[in-house]
Amino acid sequence: MTDPAPATADGLTHFDTAGNAVMVDVSAKDETERVAVAGGCVEMAPATLRAIIERGLKKGDVLSVAQLAGIMGAKRTPDLIPLCHPLALTKVAVELTPDPDHDRVVITATCALRGRTGVEMEALTAVAVAGLTVYDMCKAVDKGMRLTDIRLLSKTGGKSGTWTAS
């Protein structure tokens, strides 16, 4: 077994010097408050969005179920993304907002903790799982929905400090 390197020559941290996948050793990092916010959208037909808003779908309250699914997704991130550390999240908030002007549901997730590694993947996973849940609950009436624009919006904490998407 080879010793893990801090990063490969091209800056990748999840590979050792021999190119093997490794979980990054964060034991030497300082614990700091870390927050990440991610966002995304589910685009759909106007009638589908109307049915969501009016709670007229057979599977129930789409926004509430998707909100819970997003929270659960954030908590299960290390089970889904192979090299993510299990984290003691102190906050997971998922908001789903209907946007009738653009026939979509806008999803925002905020994750926080005090720890040695960031929560970006947890926030992104929360958005993706919430979006997939919207799709699952509405696919009987609209198979053409699209999950779009899933991305990190901001992060704070750690040695890289604050970052905000432009």
UniProtKB/Swiss-Prot annotation:
Alphabetized UniProt keyword annotations: Lyase, Molybdenum cofactor biosynthesis
Superkingdom per UniProt: Bacteria
EC nos: 4.6.1.17
Lyase recorded as keyword: yes
Pathway annotation: Cofactor biosynthesis; molybdopterin biosynthesis
Root EC class: lyase
Catalytic activity: (8S)-3',8-cyclo-7,8-dihydroguanosine 5'-triphosphate = cyclic pyranopterin phosphate + diphosphate
Biological processes per GO annotation: Mo-molybdopterin cofactor biosynthetic process
Binding site for substrate: L83, C84, H85, M121, E122
Pfam families: MoaC (PF01967)
Catalytic residues (positions): D136
InterPro entries: MoaC, MoaC_bact/euk, MoaC_sf, MoCo_biosynth_MoaA/MoaC, Mopterin_CF_biosynth-C_dom
GO MF term set: cyclic pyranopterin monophosphate synthase activity
UniProt cross-references to PANTHER family, sorted A to Z: CYCLIC PYRANOPTERIN MONOPHOSPHATE SYNTHASE, MOLYBDOPTERIN COFACTOR SYNTHESIS PROTEIN A
Family that this chain belongs to: Belongs to the MoaC family.
Subunit note: Homohexamer; trimer of dimers.
NCBIfam families with a match to the protein in the record: moaC, PRK09364.1
Function: Catalyzes the conversion of (8S)-3',8-cyclo-7,8-dihydroguanosine 5'-triphosphate to cyclic pyranopterin monophosphate (cPMP).
Record-given protein name: Cyclic pyranopterin monophosphate synthase
